[in-house]
Every structure is written in structure tokens, then in C-alpha cells.
């Protein structure tokens, strides 16, 4: 069967071969994507459960962003890995009607764009926390964070509508047009070049600031953990998505006809690497954060024993001194202006001493 979803094409046969011919990777793609779905979907669901508990206990913007990222990754795994690849190509083994097929394609682009762009406000949030700690709680608070997340989801969906006309550049009879070139370049800019530029610039400033203030840094502080998670997420994204962008542009402009089989193999591998990005965040969180590991273990233990998790005690109002990694709690009583509590709408209220 031909795989018409060119943006993540990794199916068992393409039009470069005769109908029914086997993919150069054999059954590797279907095995890989099946494992990716079986591993990534439960991992992201568990991540959503844990982060939901953390959001309920602590009014912290970064937890909201990571929660939104996990939800977006679930959508990517569902629409792209399950519906587009496994269901259409291997379970149903038939081409879907054009209109539903294109609608699903728009949802695929929307989910992958959301998964990428939700990390941008997280990066900005960490930049403000590290570089402008005195202003952090007046700029970043739960109510505003939720509005930003909703805006990202809506914007990514609306900007994905033009991808209804996404071209199938992988077919043998594909004829390139200027409109297709513009759409493909917009895709490359929006999913990789622009986000990576933002990540590189802001992360570089954060690293410089942390090194400059290293003598005052509070080791093991939560902001350090969140910043480490941010660096890891963005670095892995840039690494795993680079081959896919390179292969799209190479095939669009310079793939020789005699090397189409090799280009197909390399494109399949590039797409596998790109989608791997949606399934590994849970394991990164467990590796970096002891709190996340502990909560994951408790959640799994309660699930397999069919028991309720113990209710964690926390106050009705969360108090936060600062997200700066170099202000010691021992000296926090001297910083009266930085003590906040949150109202029922999640907006900060300064507490008088």
C-alpha cells in the first residue's frame, strides 16, 4: 500500500517500487512503531498523572508546561503512530478516503507542532526564572500559564489547516510547484529552525548566567532540576529531528533517481528518530528528578496493587519565595517582596510580613 502521509512516511511500500513490493527495512518499521506506541503511550499517560498531582500540590508554571507537553506527545502517538501508520497501513491495509485522510493529516501536523512549540514558553519561563528572578512571580503564574498553553494549542491547530494541501513528495510522479516549496519550507522553519534558534539563544543565556552566578547557586534546588530537564529535552529534540529535516530538503531538491531506494531507507530511519522524541521524556524525568522517580514508583505500585495512593498533605495556598537558583532559603526572610501566595484563580498575591 502507498503511504500518502509524506511528512512522516515510513510504511512498508512506497510508489518507488511496484505495488506490493517490500520495504527496504522489511518489518522493522512496524515492529519499531508498535514498540514505540506500547512503550510511549503508557509512559506519557503516567507522566500526565504524576504531573497533574504535582500541579495540584505546587503552583509551578514549569509543571503545567511539562503536563501540556506530555498531552501533546500522546496526541502525536495516537494520530501519527497509531492511526496513520499502524491502523491505516498494517491493520486496515487500505487507503482512506481523501477528505478524512487530509483531516487526519491536519491533526497530525497540529499535534506535532504543539508538541514542539509548547517547549518554547517553557524555555522562556526558565529564562525569566534564572535571569530575572525578582520579576518571575509577577510574570509567570498558573493563571497566565494556562492561558499560554491554550493559546499554543489553538494557534498550532489553526496554523496547521493549510497542511490540508501538503504535497506527497515521495511519489514517483510528483511534480514540484512553487506553492509546495513554500509550504515545505514553512514546515521546516516552524517545526525545527525557529524553535531550535529560540532554544539555542535562551539556553545559552541561561548557561552563561548560571556559570556567572555559580558561586551563589543552591545545589539541588528545584529550579536546577527543571532547567536540566529543559536542556535535555531541547537538545534531544534538536538531535533527533535534524535527520528528518535534512532528508525532506534533500529529497525535494537533489535526490537522484538512481538513489531513491537509499533515500527511502534513510528517510524511514530519520522519521523513526523524530518520533522517538515523543516517547522518551518520561524516562528523562525519572533519570533527572528524584521526586518524579519516587512518585512514578508510588503510582505504579498503587496501580498494580489496586490501592489508592496516600493523600499528600499540602496547604491550601502555596507560598513561594523565588525560583532563583542562587538565593538561599536561609536568607529568604530578608527578601520580603518575593513572598507570594496565589488566589483561587492562580494569580499571585503579595503577602505582607
UniProtKB/Swiss-Prot annotation:
Subcellular location: Cell membrane
GO cellular component: plasma membrane
UniProtKB keywords: Cell membrane, G-protein coupled receptor, Glycoprotein, Membrane, Receptor, Transducer, Transmembrane, Transmembrane helix
Residue intervals passing through the bilayer: 30-50, 66-86, 103-123, 149-169, 182-202, 229-249, 269-289
A Pfam family: 7tm_1
Cytoplasmic side: 51-65, 124-148, 203-228, 290-353
Keyword tRNA processing attributed: no
Main location: membrane
Membrane topology value: Multi-pass membrane protein
Residue spans, topological domain Extracellular: 1-29, 87-102, 170-181, 250-268
Biological process annotations from GO: G protein-coupled receptor signaling pathway; phospholipase C-activating G protein-coupled receptor signaling pathway
GO molecular function annotation: identical protein binding; neuropeptide receptor activity
Glycosylation sites noted in the Swiss-Prot or TrEMBL record: 11
Domain of life: Eukaryota
Tissue specificity statement from the Swiss-Prot or TrEMBL entry: Expressed almost exclusively in the brain. Detected at very low levels in the peripheral tissues.
Role this protein plays: Orphan receptor. Seems to act through a G(q/11)-mediated pathway.
Similarity comment: Belongs to the G-protein coupled receptor 1 family.
Protein name per Swiss-Prot or TrEMBL: Probable G-protein coupled receptor 139
Native source organism of the sequence: Homo sapiens (Human)
Taxonomy of the source species: Eukaryota, Metazoa, Chordata, Craniata, Vertebrata
Gene this protein is translated from: GPR139
Amino acid at each position: 500500500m502507498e503511504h500518502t502521509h509524506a511528512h512522516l512516511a515510513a510504511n512498508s511500500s512506497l510508489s518507488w517500487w511496484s505495488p506490493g513490493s517490500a520495504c527496504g527495512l522489511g518489518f522493522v518499521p512496524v515492529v519499531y512503531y508498535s514498540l514505540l506506541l506500547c512503550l510511549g503511550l503508557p509512559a506519557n499517560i503516567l507522566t500526565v498523572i504524576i504531573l497533574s498531582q504535582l500541579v495540584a500540590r505546587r503552583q509551578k508554571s514549569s509543571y503545567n508546561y511539562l503536563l501540556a507537553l506530555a498531552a501533546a506527545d500522546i496526541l502525536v502517538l495516537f494520530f501519527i503512530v497509531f492511526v496513520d501508520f499502524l491502523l491505516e497501513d498494517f491493520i486496515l491495509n487500505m487507503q482512506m478516503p481523501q477528505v478524512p485522510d487530509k483531516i487526519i493529516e491536519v491533526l497530525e501536523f497540529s499535534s506535532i507542532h504543539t508538541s514542539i512549540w509548547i517547549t518554547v514558553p517553557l524555555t522562556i519561563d526558565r529564562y525569566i526564572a534564572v535571569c530575572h528572578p525578582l520579576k518571575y512571580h509577577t510574570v509567570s503564574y498558573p493563571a497566565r500559564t494556562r492561558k499560554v498553553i491554550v493559546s499554543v494549542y489553538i494557534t498550532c491547530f489553526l496554523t496547521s489547516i493549510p497542511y490540508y494541501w501538503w504535497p506527497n513528495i515521495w511519489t514517483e510522479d510528483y511534480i514540484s510547484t512553487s506553492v509546495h516549496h513554500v509550504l515545505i519550507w514553512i514546515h521546516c522553519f516552524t517545526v525545527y529552525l525557529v524553535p531550535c534558534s529560540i532554544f539555542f539563544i535562551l539556553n545559552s543565556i541561561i548557561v552563561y548566567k548560571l556559570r556567572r552566578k555559580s558561586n551563589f547557586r543552591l545545589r539541588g534546588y528545584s529550579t536546577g532540576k527543571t532547567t536540566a530537564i529543559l536542556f535535555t529535552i531541547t537538545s534531544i529534540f534538536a538531535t533527533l529531528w535534524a535527520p528528518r529535516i535534512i532528508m525532506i530538503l534533500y529529497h525535494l531538491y537533489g535526490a537522484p533517481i538512481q538513489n531513491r531506494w537509499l533515500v527511502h531507507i534513510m528517510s524511514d530511519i530519520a522519521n523513526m528518530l523524530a518520533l522517538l522524541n515523543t516517547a522518551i521524556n518520561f524516562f528523562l524525568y525519572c533519570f533527572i528528578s528524584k521526586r518524579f522517580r519516587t512518585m512514578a514508583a508510588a503510582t505504579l505500585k498503587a496501580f498494580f496493587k489496586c490501592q489508592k495512593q496516600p493523600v499528600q498533605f499540602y496547604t491550601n495556598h502555596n507560598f513561594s519565595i523565588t525560583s532563583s537558583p542562587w538565593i538561599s532559603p536561609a536568607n529568604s526572610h530578608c527578601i520580603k517582596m518575593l513572598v507570594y501566595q496565589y488566589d483561587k484563580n492562580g494569580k499571585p498575591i503579595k503577602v505582607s510580613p
